Amino acid sequence: MNAHANPRPAVRSDWTREEIAALFDLPFNDLLWQAQAAHRAAHAANEVQLSTLLSIKTGGCPEDCGYCNQSVHAETGLKATKLMDVRAVLQSAAQARDAGSTRFCMGAAWRNPKDRDMPAIVEMVKGVRQMGMETCMTLGMLTGDQARTLADAGLDYYNHNIDTAPERYDQVITTRTFEDRIETLEHVREAGINVCCGGIVGMGETRADRVGFIHALATLPVHPESVPVNALVPVKGTVLGDMLADTPLAKIDEIEFVRTVAVARITMPASMVRLSAGRESMSDAAQALCFMAGANSIFTGDKLLTTDNAGDDRDAALFARLGVTPMAAECKVELAAE
């Protein structure tokens, strides 16, 4: 059977919390069997997309996200930087492309971008696309006009995570609301940009909270094209890093993490499910189970914004052991006009 015979299978946006909870409660083998079947119906079974994430503006963010060491409220000693020069960003993109990445993601530690920064952002998007790579930005909240500007520049994806379950949101962040996140996602959709939206598990939440997190994503009118699933990297000096340090909750159980990936795959079968932060501390066996559960995208390189990542050599060795191959880029090279 052609793995791409049904690239966009029928999807549902009417999942109930009870249905999602029942998936989480399945025997592990049954859950993985369902997830793998859903995965193969829409995606190549043994291909994984390689993406690279670059911090183009680090630290100094006014938001109080309890998980983030780039917040001005965190006491981590991280020094804030200005927005990177366009040329330096494009040099990093070229290095990522040469290392095998097909998507280049650029992240800025802002509550929202200022209009004065948009011309440089536009040049970054255009420059990366001319290399034949897919582009993704995560810049915080957007206005409708800013989303349209990014769309006109050719931006492929905009990342804006919902972070956690709606009912738990104010326990993690107080400087914005869950509804603020949804509003930006609506602007991105209306502008015609693909949505990258997921969140973080391992923040001391319960399984019921993880059910709520998946439910919020799987009941969006249109599912995100990419769903990053992050495992919290506890950083000393952040609210959650200090709260969870030296407790059993400091790291999510790997089997529970795999379950979360599997449920994301079943409920959002056409989406790319990306293993994101926290992968550097996962065993190879746990990562292999995540791929079995339907994950088909990872971030490569030694860094994810300001935290450590698994690294290219370890990833290449794991792919070789698993018989997994990198996915080709969908973005065509755009030649500049003469």
From Swiss-Prot:
Molecular-function annotations in GO: 2 iron, 2 sulfur cluster binding; 4 iron, 4 sulfur cluster binding; biotin synthase activity; iron ion binding
Biological processes annotated in GO: biotin biosynthetic process
UniProt KW Electron transport keyword: no
EC number(s) from the headed UniProt entry: 2.8.1.6
Database matches in InterPro entries: Aldolase_TIM, BATS_dom, Biotin_synth/BioAB, Biotin_synthase, Elp3/MiaA/NifB-like_rSAM, rSAM
UniProt keywords, alphabetically: 2Fe-2S, 4Fe-4S, Biotin biosynthesis, Iron, Iron-sulfur, Metal-binding, S-adenosyl-L-methionine, Transferase
Pathway assigned to this chain's UniProt record: Cofactor biosynthesis; biotin biosynthesis; biotin from 7,8-diaminononanoate: step 2/2
Binding residue positions for [4Fe-4S] cluster: 61, 65, 68
Function in brief: Catalyzes the conversion of dethiobiotin (DTB) to biotin by the insertion of a sulfur atom into dethiobiotin via a radical-based mechanism.
Name this polypeptide is given: Biotin synthase
Annotated gene: bioB
